[in-house]
């Protein structure tokens, strides 16, 4: 009996570490995909979301925070720094007005950014630590969970009001309109769980199971988003990387919630 409990605990710790790896490496992929995206725009004489001098500082801060988080050095402080850096850069890109996106694409982009910020706040609370030396900050974790709930509300909203997202589900998932409504209800219930703070572990476990097929069939269908919906290739790859980071957050909360 004790050996079964020990092996189960070991497996949960291994899965939790996997979630931490996916989340802490997310900024590296974000910076790489942004560099590739802005290189493509430069060839077409188009501007990046953030002016170039500030862009280098922004990416430098992201890589710095990601590096320290990855090595586990002052992870809580640098996770908080990563959340702050991402919030500032997103706000700067939004008010800059250098690039104009469709409303449906803004919802997809900014909702994922909110979820990643929430993931960093969860990490800053002490969740996902293999050997926790300090007590966990419940306020930071609750705030991060609220951000995840906001993301899920945005996803549910897109399923009802964005024809681009609806077609992505209709074309690549069986069940048609019934499947869309089931996903809408499921996203709504999960959002309520994260926003209220009740059944968070169960909600995170369901989300961790739900996200991989959605990432593979919906976000991973680059041909649909790039060729049909004219989403820039590296922008879609950035969104896909953020979905992986959100999955990492769900795994952390599912195993250490």
Swiss-Prot record:
Any single GO CC term annotated in Swiss-Prot or TrEMBL for this entry: membrane
Membrane-traversing stretches: 21-40, 52-72, 77-97, 110-130, 139-159, 182-202, 206-226, 233-253
Top-level taxon in the UniProt lineage: Eukaryota
Kinase recorded as keyword: no
Pfam families tied to this protein: TMEM101 (PF15111)
Main localization of the protein described in the UniProt heading: membrane
Bilayer topology: Multi-pass membrane protein
A Gene Ontology BP annotation from the UniProt entry: positive regulation of canonical NF-kappaB signal transduction
Keywords: Membrane, Transmembrane, Transmembrane helix
Cellular localisation: Membrane
Reported function: May activate NF-kappa-B signaling pathways.
Protein name stated in the entry: Transmembrane protein 101
Phylogenetic classification of the source organism: Eukaryota, Metazoa, Chordata, Craniata, Vertebrata
């Amino acid at each position: 009996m004790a050996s079964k409990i020990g092996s189960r605990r070991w497996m949960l710790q291994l899965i939790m570490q996997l979630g931490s790896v996916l989340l802490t490496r997310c900024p590296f992929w974000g910076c790489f995909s942004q560099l590739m995206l802005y290189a493509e725009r430069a060839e077409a004489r188009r501007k990046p979301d953030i002016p170039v001098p500030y862009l280098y500082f922004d990416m430098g801060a992201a890589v710095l925070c990601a590096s320290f988080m990855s090595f586990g050095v002052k992870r809580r402080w640098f996770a908080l720094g990563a959340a702050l850096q991402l919030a500032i850069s997103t706000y700067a890109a939004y008010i800059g007005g250098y690039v104009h996106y469709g409303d449906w694409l803004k919802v997809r982009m900014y909702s994922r950014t909110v979820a990643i910020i929430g993931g960093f706040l969860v990490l800053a609370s002490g969740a996902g630590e293999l050997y926790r030396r300090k007590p966990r900050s419940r306020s930071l974790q609750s705030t991060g969970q609220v951000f995840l709930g906001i993301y899920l509300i945005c996803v549910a909203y897109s399923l009802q009001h964005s024809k681009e997202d609806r077609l992505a589900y209709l074309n690549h998932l069986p069940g048609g309109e019934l499947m869309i409504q089931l996903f809408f209800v499921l996203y709504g219930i999960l959002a309520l769980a994260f926003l209220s703070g009740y059944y968070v572990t169960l909600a995170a476990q369901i989300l961790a199971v739900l996200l991989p097929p959605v990432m593979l069939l919906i976000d991973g269908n680059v041909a649909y988003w790039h060729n049909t919906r004219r989403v820039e290739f590296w922008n879609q790859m950035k969104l896909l990387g953020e979905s992986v980071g959100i999955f990492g957050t769900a795994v952390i909360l599912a195993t250490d919630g």
